[in-house]
Amino acid sequence: MNKLLNIAQAGHRQFVREYAFKSDLKIKWMRPEKIACYKPEKSGDLAKLPPLKADELLPEYRDCKELDKADESVKSLFKLSNNASYLTTKFYRDEMVKEVQRHAQDFGSMEAKLAKMTAVIRRYQEHMDKHPRDKMIKVRLKELIDKRKKFLKYLRRWDYPRFEWILEKLDLVYKPPPTHFHWITRKESLQKLTDIYCENLKEERLEAYHKQLQAQQIPFLEEAIKKMQFVRQEQISCDVPVTVTEEKIADSKRQLEMLKELQQAEAAASSKKQNEDGFN
């Protein structure tokens, strides 16, 4: 082992595993959290089911006049919240179908089918939030989401205005399947993050260098004006052709005045901002 290390240090570093070395860049990559297939973020459901009223009765007994005279303990037996869960699912399903059905007896159109599936999907999603290990409901929910997505695909192909209308009524987002699947790998992600880091570093250094040059503009122009005046005086005294004209010197002085005014305005703006931040 020592012999291999000596060879690697002496000659070409072909024995050193440089790909396994830790980078000095302060870049940390975290694998994106996997979203379950039954979550609303994946299924496309933008809204949840409305909360159930505490005094909501079973649909069959809403118009029963005898319940108005009955005792509270008797009324509680006919409340929807005190009965089986499938009755609540049926209640939500019927209410959602009423919003999209074409007529009172419409239960077989594409809109009614999508409303039924959406109500059941959202009920199952609420169940999975409370019981995430329920495998049977998870499988049913996944199959129902895929079936609804297939129906939406067909409706989008057949009647696009009706497709948009049903999405608006049911608070859905249609997510078509991707054309190709792309794996998220650590290597590719680190390459992209490194490119972004290098680009930001380059921009920061260029900005710092630009500010440094801007800070040197006024001293540079002052020194340049002095030198131009000196060169002009020497050329006149030596009786040689004058290359530095008064117009050049005047232009440099005007540029110097503009830079000083700009610097004063920036200083006033920065001081005003600091005062406002201090008051806040």
Curated annotation (Swiss-Prot):
A single GO molecular-function term is: structural constituent of ribosome
Please verify whether the record's keywords include Protease. no
Transmembrane segments annotated in the record for this chain = none
Q: Does the keyword Nucleus apply?
A: no
GO cellular component terms given for this protein = mitochondrial small ribosomal subunit; mitochondrion
Q: Where does the UniProt entry say this protein principally localizes? A: mitochondrion
Null mutant phenotype:
Mutants exhibit a strong systemic growth defect and die before reaching wild-type size.
Q: Which GO terms describe its biological process?
A: mitochondrial translation; regulation of growth
Q: What span is annotated as the signal peptide, if there is one?
A: none
According to its UniProt record, in which tissues is this protein expressed?
Expressed in anterior and posterior midgut primordia in stage 11 embryos. In stage 13 embryos, expression is high in the developing midgut and hindgut. In stage 16 embryos, expression is elevated in the midgut, hindgut, and in a small region that will give rise to pharyngeal muscles and to the stomatogastric nervous system. In larvae, expression is predominant in the gut, and head, presumably in pharyngeal muscles.
- Report the locations given in the UniProt record: Mitochondrion
Hey, which family's this protein in? Answer: Belongs to the universal ribosomal protein uS15 family.
Query: HAMAP family, per this entry?
Result: Ribosomal_uS15_B
How does the record describe its quaternary structure?
Component of the mitochondrial ribosome small subunit (28S) which comprises a 12S rRNA and about 30 distinct proteins.
Role = Essential for gut mitochondrial activity. Might be involved in tissue specific growth factor production.
Protein name, as recorded: Small ribosomal subunit protein uS15m
What gene name does this entry carry?
bonsai
